[in-house]
Amino acid sequence: MIDKKKCLMKPLAFTIAAILSTSALADDEVELDDGETMTVHATAKEELKQQPGVSIITAEDIEKTPPVNDLSEIIRKMPGVNLTGNSASGSRGNNRQIDIRGMGPENTLILVDGVPVTSRNSVRYSWRGERDTRGDTNWVPPELVERIEVIRGPAAARYGNGAAGGVINIITKRPTNDWHGALSLFTNQPENDKEGATKRANFNLSGPLAGDALTMRLYGNINKTDADDYDINTQQNGSYAAGREGVRNKDINGVLSWKITPEQILDVEYGYSRQGNIYAGDTQYSNGNLSPNGLVESLYGQETNRLYRQNYGITHNGIWEWGQSRVGFYYEKTNNTRLQEGSTGRVEGMINSDQYATSRLENYRANGEINLPLNLWVEQTLTLGAEWEREELNDPASMQSTSAEGVVINGVSGDPSARSSKNSADISALYLEDNIEALPGTFIIPGLRFDYHNKFGGNWSPSLNLSQALGDYVKLKAGIARAYKAPNLYQSSEGYLLSTRGNGCPNNIASGSCYLTGNDDLKPETSVNKEIGLEFTKDGFDAGITYFRNDYKNKIVAGTELLGLASNGYNILQWENGGKAVVEGLEGNLTVPVVKDTLSWRTNATYMIQSKNKDTGNPLSIIPEYTINTMLDWQATEKLSANLNWTLYGRQKPREYAESRNETGSMSSREVGAYSIVGVGMNYQLTKNLRVNGGVSNLFDKQLYRENDGASTYNEPGRAYYAGVTMSF
């Protein structure tokens, strides 16, 4: 074995960086040009991916259980992950997004190839903390994913603003040195003709444009999922709750990769996506029957909102005599065009016009990172990084919707034309972390991050993670970190004004109507996230159990503290920092090689001990008490594989305590009982270049119909049949 420190003084093949980016171990052996080998010590970022709160979904996993449309459908099968709304209110109940460890979708940071994707932030933030959005996990088609990293707990804190719950990093397929291409077709057909069917087609092409020096990757995708029938829930239970809306996706994305030298690569990326909905009748408060002139009913099946997203990026990765570097510059623009909505009381979020308005969100990002292998007393890799982000929002329809001409509200004009439709924020950050091999089998990863927000000041986020081998097969792993989330651009905008004539006022306001204004004097939300776990690995057997706890404070909520009275006598409230909340639970996983290389059994489970706001006693979001995902994976022959998968969801409890005046004395105790979903699937490699797959989801046709009553906030689709074919070269 050659000396590592001496090797670092040589020009290294850039494959070292690629190996580190996909490492499954703490260290890797790399063969140098002269035939000798060296040990490359992993960075803190890669070592953190071995912590108990991290799961990896591979391209092969996606082939075995393909999502119908959105990647969230397979991400939800990881430990600690569920689909839910951002609050326990139940509004927008079928627009479920990724929730990690009960912290809510707004605390889940979505990345594509390591870069934040924040198009959902262009959608108006409601009084109860929900957005009419599908989230940001549907910008990449499943067939173009190389892997998905699901990062929970302390390991996620290094990513900064918005990662208090966790991080989803969607890694796309890279350019290749040889020409490769594929055309994929997929369809999903529900047995219930009131549920929406899906059709998808996409292609990808990658290869060299100038030998190994210049390579490219291009993909395109088109997908359509129909909306559920307008009366899918009404027919079952008489409710006006809407079913799942449909979506049309169109995506194109390209990457040029220039190998400047064997040690330096420059990537240039451009992407364009369009997502349009197929309206199913949702009105935020499920009261579409109150729509004036039957407008809501007349819009069923039409496109009422569409998002246009563009992203540009340039990234440089380098290997130097002293270590590795990465520098990137990125721009993301989202135009959110939708029919205008109400902003007052019970019609908040209800479409009230046939006129479209556009909200524009622009994000500018720059970041850089260096990794320095050191041998100061012990082997270690020091990481130093810096980030800068600017976000700019212009949403005239939401900021200027509420009209109270001639009224002054806590210094803010009630006249829409006098209120700004714009808001912006700048966040700068510095961070350092060190992957220290203190002893053989002992890794310690201290970290420190400082974020500075131009409106809300600075925030320190320290972290400490540990991995300790306990013999050859068992490891103890633990971590603690302080995570952080800045106020969003609606909460912090003085011009964002909502109102209610009384019923929507908090229940401590005994009488009168209310205004809710933005607040530029908020504190960032923080959470101290902790976990400790044991891991066993031997001869294909894997088992682990992890305890986690998040102590969450300063959660930003619609205010209950009366600031005074407006000139028209309305009570004035503003967005404010709430008290404390706590989330804790257990996660476990088990993999058993029943028949080596032929039949394996994989299981993971999550049990929520508690999830509640200490001020109100209500849960942060509605999620199952426990979730168990298990799969038998059978490699029948070299060409044929099949799987049987089963998911058990525990009971889901609603909010117990009224938060608004109209809820007092009328809270529903309706629970969703435990239920399970079974599916079967198969893949067959017909030829070297032709693969087919198919299966049945929800084999026993367990359906849930949304009632908008208590915890009954969403539809669980019934039995469906799917099939796909991929032709490649």
Predicted regions and their residues:
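Gram-negative outer-membrane beta-barrel transporters
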Residues: S184, E437-G441, Y547-Y552, L563-E659, ...
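Short, acidic, small-residue-rich periplasmic hinge/interaction motif at the N-terminus
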Residues: A26-K64, P105, D113
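C-terminal beta-signal and adjacent terminal beta-strands/loops
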Residues: T118-V123, K553, A558, L648-E659, ...
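Extracytoplasmic beta-strand/coil segments of soluble accessory domains associated
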Residues: S72-S119
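Periplasmic-side early beta-strands and strand-to-turn transitions of outer-membrane beta-barrels
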Residues: T176-L299, N554
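Short acidic/polar hinge/loop motifs at secondary-structure boundaries
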Residues: V117-R152
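Outer membrane beta-barrel strand-and-loop segments of large Gram-negative receptors
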Residues: S353, N363-L372, R419-N423, A429, ...
